[in-house]
Structure formats: C-alpha cells, structure tokens
Amino acid sequence: MSVVNFYGQLSNTQQFDQIRINIASPDQVRSWSFGEVTKPETINYRTFKPEKDGLFCARIFGPVKDYECLCGKYKRMKNRGITCEKCGVEVTVSRVRRERMGHIELAAPVAHIWFLKSLPSRISTLLDMTMRDVEKILYFENYVVVDPGLSILQKGELLTEEELQKAKDKYGEDAFTASIGAEVIQQMLKELDFSKLKQELYEELQTTSSEVKKKKLVKRLKLVENFLESENKPEWMIMDVLPVIPPEIRPLVMLDGGRFATSDLNELYRRVINRNNRLKKLIESKAPDIIVRNEKRMLQEAVDALFDNGRRGRAAKNANKRPFKSLSDMLKGKQGRFRQNLLGKRVDYSGRSVIVVGPELKLHQCGLPKKMALELFKPFIYSKLELYGIATTIKAAKRMVEAEKSEVWDVLEEVIREHPVLLNRAPTLHRLGIQAFEPLLIEGKAIQLHPLVCAAFNADFDGDQMAVHIPLSIEAQLEARVFMMSTNNILSPANGRPIIVPDKDIVLGLYYLTLAFDNEVGAGMMFSDLAEMEHALYNKFITIHTKIKYRRNQLNAEGKMVPVIIDTTYGRLMVGELLPSNPNIEFKCINKQLTKKDISLVIDLVYRHCGQKATVIFADQLMKLGFKYACSSGISFGMDDMVVPESKSTHINETQLEIKEFEQQYSNGLITYGEKYNKVVDAWSRCTDRVANDMMKEIATPPVNDAPNHQKINAIYMMAISGARGSFQQIKQLGGMRGLMTKSNGQIIQTPIISNFKEGLTEFECFNSANGMRKGQIDTALKTASSGYLTRKLVDVAQDCIITEKDCGTDKGIEVKSVIEGGEVIVPLAEKILGRTAAIDIFHPVTNDLILNKGELINEAKLEQIESAGFDRIMIKSVLTCESTTGICSICYGRDLATGTLVSEGEAIGVIAAQSIGEPGTQLTMRTFHIGGAATKGAEVSSVDASYDAKVKIISRNVVINSEERKIVMSRNCELLLLDNNGNEKARHKIPYGARLLVDDGDMVIKTQKLAEWDPYTIPIITEKSGKVLFKDMVEGISIRDVTDEATGIPSKVIIESKQYSRGAELRPRIQLLDAKGEVITLSNGLEARYYLPVGAVLSVEDGVQISVGDIIARIPKESTTTKDITGGLPRVAELVEARRPKDHAVIAEIDGRVEFGKDYKSKRRIIIHPIDETMSIEYMVPKGKHVVVNEGDFVKKGDLLIDGNPVLQDILKVMGVEVLANYIVNEVQAVYRLQGVKIDDKHIEVIIRQMLQKVEVTDSGGTTLLVGEKIDRHEFDEINEKAMKNGLKPAEAQLILQGITKASLQTRSFISAASFQETTRVLTEAAIAGKVDKLRGLKENVIVGRLVPAGTGYFMDKMRKAAAKLDEENV
C-alpha cells in the first residue's frame, strides 16, 4: 500500500472535468447502500450506543469511534479492516459515517414529489394527463383504466369507486382492468415507447394548426427527447427503494441535561420507516383493501414530506408547530447547502476588531493589535520557536506563547515582516472591499487603517469593524501581494479613475494651503529657492497665501532642466515640491486653488506618466501635507458664516404675487388644476434657486473690511467648494430657503418652506418637512436590500464571463457618438471611446493619415489626435459583437480599467461588471430628489437657446404661419441642428409639435439667442388650414362633458371615455374644418381636415366658430401624459436589466410608412401603417385613452413612437436590432447613475447586455432536430447548424431574444450555478431528467465543487491541467 493512500484516499476533487446529474435507478440506490434500515430507532437512551438496523446503526454506517467496533472487542489501528463477528461493525475511521448510505425497501412504490409537483409536472406531461388526475390516482381517490378489454371505456379514463362498481356490474369482473396507486402509474410509465411516441408527436406537430396545442406538443416532445438522450427510464420517477443519507449529515447531538437535539430528517425518516413496516405487516396479514390503501397513501405522504415538506397538502410539523426541514429545504435559499456552506464558508485564521484612523501609516501598511497578531500567527510562531531551538517541542512552544514570554514577541516581529494580511469590510460590494496590507504591530485593541483607502472600503471611523484574514500558503501570500496590495489598487475598476483620492479634511487643508490673496504682506517678492522663502515666512515677511514670483527648474521634453519664473504662492510651492519630475506634469496643474476634483486629476496624471510607485508616494505625502494644514488653519464655522441674502424677501414676495396670478387664472377657468399645480411648483423651484444663487454670491465674495485677509473667506463656502464636506444643496437649506418638500409618495407639496435652518422653521413648516425626512430614512433601510439583490442577480448572470483569448478576429463593432441631451453634450465622444479598441482603420478626414489601426487600443495620446480631427462618431469593438465561443477576447473588451493596460487573459470581467453596476446601487436613492426631504425638481424646459454661434439647420421642417405671423411647428419629429463653420454638428435639439420657431433654416445665430419656445404643460392640437369648426360625435354626457371646476365654477368641455353608445356605434370625438361651402377642407397630404381628440383633451373652440391657420383647437394637459412614472434610481435599472415591460409603454412603428386610423374595436383604437411599397400593412391596437403622438397622414420612420412612453426593450430589438437596443439600455442605465454623479464605464453595462442576449428562438427548424419556438443558446444553435450543413441538410433559422437577468441566470448552461441561484428544486429536477452535464466553466460551479476558480491564476492552472491531460492522452 502506498504512503499516499495510508491515511485514506486523497481527495479526488481535482480529478474530474465535468459533473453529470441523473435520476437514480433502484439498482443504483441499492449499490450505494451498505445495508437496509429496518427499524425507526436511533440510539439507545441508556447506553447511548446506536441501535442495530436503526437509523444510526454502526453495522450499516460504520463505527462511532475511530478504529473501534461497537462492542469493544477490536480496538486500535492494528485491527484495521476487520469486521467484528460479534457486533458486525467494520473497524475503520469514523469518518465513513459521513459517506456511507443505507436504504429502505419500500413495501409499495411511491412517486417522487419533485417529478410530480415541480411545475410543469413531468409525470403528467409524459402520460398526457392533468396533474390533478395523476394526483387522484396516486393518492387513492380514483381508479384509472389500464386495459379497456371488452368494455367501451377509454384507456386512461378515471373512475370513482362507485363508477368502478357500476362498470364491473355492467361488463363483468374481468372484462377490463382498472387499478389505483403508484403501481399503476409506474406500469403506465414503463409501457411508454419513446421512439414511437416521438414519431407520433412529430407527425401531430406538423399537422396541427392550433397554437395552444403546438405549445403543448412541443413541451411533451422536448421531455420525450430528454429521456431518450439521457437514458433515464421514466419508471424511475416512481421509487421502489429509498436511499438513507449518512448519519453524520443528519446528526443527533446530546444536550446538557440528558436531552437530545436531532436533525429533522431523522424524524421524517422515522415516519417513513414506521409506515413502511406497518404496511408490510398489513400486506402479510392480508388486511382489507381499504386499510392497505390508506396505509399506502400515508407512506406516499411520509416520503413526500421527507423530500419536500409542504409542497403538497399540509406540512408535517413538530411539537412546537414548526414545519420539519426536508431534504429540499436543506438545499434551498440563503440558509441552504448551496449558499450557506458551499458558496459562503467561514474562514479559519481570521479575527475582527474596530478600526481607527492611522494617519502616520504608509499606504501599504495597516496597524494590527499585538494580541490579535499573536493569536493569528500562532502556527508560524510555533515553528519559528522550534526552529531556533528556543522551544523543544510544539507543546513547549504553546506554553511559551500562552505565557507571552519576551522571546515570543521578538519571533512575532520576525514572522510578521513582509507577510501580508487581508482586511475586509462588510458589506463587500466590489473587489476593493478586500485588500492586502503589511501589518505593523501596535498596542491597543483596534486595527489602524490608512485614511486614503477608506473610500474603497466605504469605511468611516464611527465604530466600523473590519475582519483580518491571513494568507497561509506561499502562493496565497504572493497573490495577496501582487494582486491585492492596496498600492496595486489605485484605480477603480468601475471607471478607471483613481480611487486613492484625498478626502474630507485633507482636501480642506490642501484648499486652504493653495489659496492666494491679493493684498497680503510681501506681495510681489521674488525668490529663487525654498530655503530663502522659509526664512521669509518664519520672519513674517510673507504668508503662505502671499502672491510671489519664484524661479523653478522644470523638466522639458528633451529631459533637460530649464528654469522658469512663475507667479505662485508659498503654499502652492509646497504642493509642487511633492510632484514627481516629468515633462508631462507641469507646475500649472497645481498652481491654482486645489479642489477635490483637481487633486484627483493630478493623481491620475501622475499615475499615467510616472507609474504606480510614484503615485503611491505622492498620494501619501499629499495626505500628510493636507492633514498638517487642515490642523494649523483652524477652519471651523459658526452661525455668522451662514449668510441669509438681503434679496430673499423680495424674491419671495415676487413669487407669491406670481402664484396669486396663477390662482386667478385658475379661478377664471383659463388653466386646469393640474396646470396650476405644475406652474406653482415651478415658480417656487425658481424662487428657491434664485435665493440660493444670491446667497452663494454673498458667501463667495468676502466682506471688505480691515480684518486680516485670510479670515475673509467663508468657512462653509470653503468646505463646499473644495469638495471636502457638504454640498451647495445643504448650504442652501442653512442660509437660503429650504424650498419645496416631497410627500412620502414622491408628490411635491405646493407650499414651500420659506425659512432656513438659521432662522428656524415655524411649527407648520417643521411638520411639513418631517414627511420627506421620514421617507428618506425608510428608503435608506429598504433600498439596501434591493440593491444587494440586484448585485447578486448581476453577478449570477455574468459570473462565467471570462477573458479567454487575445483576439476573436471579428470584423464587427458598434458605432458610438457623444450623448447629447437638450442640446448639451453630456458625455463627450472621448469619454465613451477611451480604453476601447478600433473596429476599423481610422484615417484623418482631412489629411487622410492613419490615426488608428484596426484592433488598436485608444489611449490618451490617440484620443487627442481623434479629438483634433473632429470626429463625431467612431466604430469601436465591443463585447456585444465579440465572437469567442467561450468567454470574451481581450481586443473586444479593451482596457482593463484597474490597470490602464489591455485586459489580460483569465480576467473575470463579468464579476467586475456586476460589481461596478451593483456597488453604486446602494448610493442610489429610490427616488432621486431628496436632500433631507427637499424636492429638487428642475423647472420644465420651455425654450431652446443657442449654445454656440452657429448656423441653423432644421430637419423635417413642416411649419405654418399663424394669425400672429408666428411660425408654428407642425412636424412630430422636427430637429434643430447647430452647425459650425465646417458643417460639423455642434448641438441637436428636438423641437416639439406646436412650438413657435423663432429662427429658420440657414439662419446664423449668436450664442444665447432664443431659437424656439413652447408651453411645457400642454400638448396642443393645431389646425393647418382656416375654416369653420364642426363638432362630430361629441355627445353631451357620453363622449364629452362640461367639467365645472369646483374651485372656480367655470365650465370647460372635456373629452371623456365614451361607453358603448345606445345604437351600438362607437363614438370617435373629432373636430372637422369646413370651407365656405360647408364641405370638409382637404389638407396638403390629400386627407380631410379632421382632428381626433383623445380622452382628457380640453376644447379651446366652440362649435361653429371661424378659426385661422395655426390656431389651437384643443389641448391635452401634460399631467395626463406624464404618467411616465419617474421610476427613479434602482427600480429603473432593475426594470431595464430584467427586461420588464414598462408600465404604460410606448408603441413603436415597425416599418416606414403612412399612418391611418382604422375602425375602432371595443376600447381599442386601430392604427394602421401603410408602407411606401404597398406591401403588407401593419396594424396596432392601442388603448383609447392614450395620446397618439402621430396624426392621420403623417409619415413615420421605422422605430418612431406612435404612443408616448418608455419603449419595450423586446420591441427595440425586433425592430431596430442589437446595436440600437444596446445603445438604448446603456444610455438609460447611465442616465440613472449620472443623476447621482456616479461614473461607470459603458463596457460593464455591455457585458451584462451580452449575457441577456445569449439565447435565440428557433423560427424554422430546417433539417435539424430543433423545434420551432424552442429557446436555445446561440453557440449551441451555431454548432447544430454546422453539423446539419456538413450532412447536407437545411440549417435552422432563429432570432435573437432578450432575457431578463434572472431568467438568463436560471437558464445558464451550468445547472450547478443555476441551482445555487434560485428555484433550486425546479432547476435540479429539469437537469436530472435531461441528464445534464456541467462542464464547470464558470466561477460559481468551481467554488461549489471546491476547486480554484478558472479566472486569474486559476485560469492558467486550469489551462495547464487541460493541456497536460491532452498530452497524456496523446502519449498513451
């Protein structure tokens, strides 16, 4: 026997490549078993020894103590392998009690509840019965006809007890066979001939036309094919023998006081054994049928409870009325086997303690309490003590450590040197939540943390705790040092910006240090070296803020030192001294008042040009400098620093007058209540902003008096402007006015809070503000959970996304352009393409020089070239178009944001993407507008101004001139472009229907010139011709109603939803225009002038009046159209990645064509689009009350909205394709994060979208075995098609489908990963029937089977292992 096998078998976890799951056959169960369990007893309560043949029997499951049989005849190692003849126990290690199984021979067959009740029920699908019927047979309620024989009964017909008796009386006892219970189901399953059944189903599928029937057939056919492929037998779903899991896995523990705590499984097994034994006795003693049947039913129920308690009927409960935990419950949920023990293990060699700040640490260090280090590094200390001969044995070493002798501390110092430890702060939302540091031993009991890493850990020192873990093996230490050291994690993987950035007081100190004042002592002095300046400072000739001239040596591009004279201050020079010398880093980047943003940019610059080491040193020194001056400046603030502006009362009075006017308009019936509400809220928003701006001006300009200069600047202003603490939002509430508050449902209360915190709130205001504050508090508590859940879903869907090759060689890419909203460039092109790779060769548009090769990385240098060339769009490679079969290639992904270089193979980009999107999720409030409940609703946009001097170009211009000689836009998709001198687009504005155009095509405009204006609160309906108004289908009280406003008593005519009219005709309220002869006027597009009015429209004209071109005949109040709920923050992100249908979604035109309104149907309107080439027209049925944004006769383009709202993602994919869809999702998700000022790189969102687009739906099966409507993995589909084409068959056709992330996770190729995510039982049931094979490609499945993950270093281990296996095969 080899030495290796001496202590039992080595774990063979490394030996397999894939795992397969199947239904166990009865013979297999018997082969696993070491004996039959026949007695329900567990252990003898007097001797505490396991009972023979019971649930803990030592003969079946193995000895209780190592190498000792039960009766004690054989003890110790020498008797290994002997089976005791007295008690029948094999002498071996007690560990076998964790792996040996037993079995129970059932007296009657029993159905496995998973295959019966897990939807869709497999047993009933195969037998083509309903689940209800199968249950009736199994639970002995009805008989089923197995063989109709001579009767006219149908095979498979159900009969009750009475019906059976009648049939027997009618046809005779033996004329037919009917039976009951699991036996008959087993027999029916056995009789199924799958190959024949498959053929029949195929034929039926070809002939049937009913969709419902097709779906049912496809389902059944799929199941039949699964059984054929997996070689499972259907009768195995009914069990004759039940496995008993090893006793150590369902332990029985003795508590103090002689009582026992037992696993629920033992209780459930006992019930099964008891009922089984009773059934055996009843059968032997030939008991009456009805009693036997009842016992069989009870046995079935007992086995059901064991497998999945509570799935059917009432759950079996214990004495405390708590349901038993069955086998299924052991796997399910957060506390189940998968998530509790396989994915989340407790870690040895770890400790946790409170953290305190360690400002004198270096960036790569942390302070570790001595006591803690002694405990954590014990094994290392023991070995060192023994090695040096200080202790003779391990035991002696242990005693020394316990006595804390002085030698021990010396050894500890040595052990700890250069041995990194991992620090982790829960919740670990992204990979920077665990970082490695070199420990320094400190007194006390708290861990010291470097201030600069707080941002990454999201830590503060108000009592946070952190955990310490020790990497033991040399490999682990190496990985900790190379990958996880805090100095190697300077850039954030989410956006590639530095995350080691000074914060809070450091920023304040640096801001104070770099201030410059005009009339300070010694202004304008000249200096040539720092020592001289220090001398002057010490003797009070200058201050740190004095503006002086200084001669500084600067590196030029050739690397020579060149003296330059600069205007600066002593404070700025101190920061300048820390800058590494590099020609690209000029003094001017810090020669200004440094805010947090500036500091971040400087650190980024240093990292890009001088590398990591220089950055770390620079950041560390910057921190020390910042702390020093934050301390010596003594900045603090008092009541007088909160300035209330003089102009506050005037602004408030003006606004109150304005609001009186709105009230007047409302009482005169000129505007609706909703419009009044909008206008009031808007007016107050504007007022608040004005007061705030005035206050800011006052704070920013120091008062002119004789106080020494550096006390002039306002402390609160300094804190906010430098980015150290607080925001202008908060200052506004301190000194301006608090403004509008939101109700708990997100509505804005019309009366604002006029006071600020300095003046104090009135009782009424205080009560009003409590509302919003309470909502904020509750939100915070609730949102954390939903954010965590979103992160978990994202990680799960993307966890197998790994970089597997350098280049997939695809020619595809996506086109990106800058994001423009409201004519402003929000995200410039440069930001979107940095760190991506070019999909094609890119040439300069003027000189035609090659700027970028295909597949070349776009770095900062290339970016400058692209920007100067003036591109407005660029083709880049993307993970969406990557063609790697497993994983993704480096070139399509581009730059690894955490390192700034091309991503390396083995990087787990999926998890990084999920973390990058999920981590800021916790910062996203549910609703996006509270600062202490204050509403920050932006005023509605009601006009467009030119942002540049430019030339106007108007797209789809359709204008009428109204009676006031104004140009009124009549087009639904009018866009106004501003072009520069070269004709490049600088800005693009959407001009709404009904707006007044103030410029025309080809005009030259100057900056800030108004281009167009409109009423933001209503959508008008405007006439294109003059004529006389004729009302049609406007029946008082049925389709139109005089709505009298209760506040004003003024009636206005409003269109209401018309119920079915008495004569059954549908009413379609409309206004027609008649000419002088009384005939309907024809419009320019050849249609009659009639305007359909949606529900809620308010009429602006009377019947029979004369109107002119461009007049408003009705208006739709905006509030009824903006039911586009502002699903803010996280719910919107979740809605997008789950691909849900938005509430009140938009309808998209699928083709280009002309719009026509067809005949209405019930409560739906029919919109028809006729394509230009007069092929098939497309019809849409839309609910009547919805506002249709097109008119009859309008020409729409593919992808235009017919009805307002958020479009359905699946529609975008179907109509516009993948690229447009991806673009839409990326922009929508980014919009949510942008509101919060969170930056995430697009590529992370693209990775998630790629995972949502994994499946295709078969539309034509061709010559393959695929079924129409089947959903299958893209790559599998391609493989099947390749095979078909090789064999000369017609390939199948399919279309891409978009799945939400939950669905995509549950349908991954790996069943282990899917089972550990959600719906464990359903996933495992499906996998077992199909005999699925898990190739162990993703991270999760490998963690579960206990291997290194195939990412990072594990990726190469995996690659080498596979290569080695291949070589072995070849050699053999």
Curated annotation (Swiss-Prot):
Binding-site list for Zn(2+) 2: C808, C882, C889, C892
Keyword match Transferase: yes
SUPFAM superfamilies: beta and beta-prime subunits of DNA dependent RNA-polymerase
EC number: 2.7.7.6
GO BP: DNA-templated transcription
InterPro entries for this protein: DNA-dir_RpoC_beta_prime, DNA-dir_RpoC_beta_prime_bact, RNA_pol_asu, RNA_pol_N, RNA_pol_Rpb1_1, RNA_pol_Rpb1_3, RNA_pol_Rpb1_3_sf, RNA_pol_Rpb1_4
Annotated cofactor note: Binds 1 Mg(2+) ion per subunit. Binds 2 Zn(2+) ions per subunit.
GO cellular component, one term: DNA-directed RNA polymerase complex
Reactions this protein catalyses: RNA(n) + a ribonucleoside 5'-triphosphate = RNA(n+1) + diphosphate
UniProt-annotated binding residues for Zn(2+) 1: C69, C71, C84, C87
Taxonomy, superkingdom: Bacteria
Top-level class of the enzyme under EC nomenclature: transferase
UniProt-listed Pfam families: RNA_pol_Rpb1_1, RNA_pol_Rpb1_2, RNA_pol_Rpb1_3, RNA_pol_Rpb1_4, RNA_pol_Rpb1_5
Function: DNA-dependent RNA polymerase catalyzes the transcription of DNA into RNA using the four ribonucleoside triphosphates as substrates.
Subunit composition and interactions: The RNAP catalytic core consists of 2 alpha, 1 beta, 1 beta' and 1 omega subunit. When a sigma factor is associated with the core the holoenzyme is formed, which can initiate transcription.
Family: Belongs to the RNA polymerase beta' chain family.
Listed name of the protein: DNA-directed RNA polymerase subunit beta'
Taxonomic source organism: Rickettsia conorii (strain ATCC VR-613 / Malish 7)
Gene field: rpoC
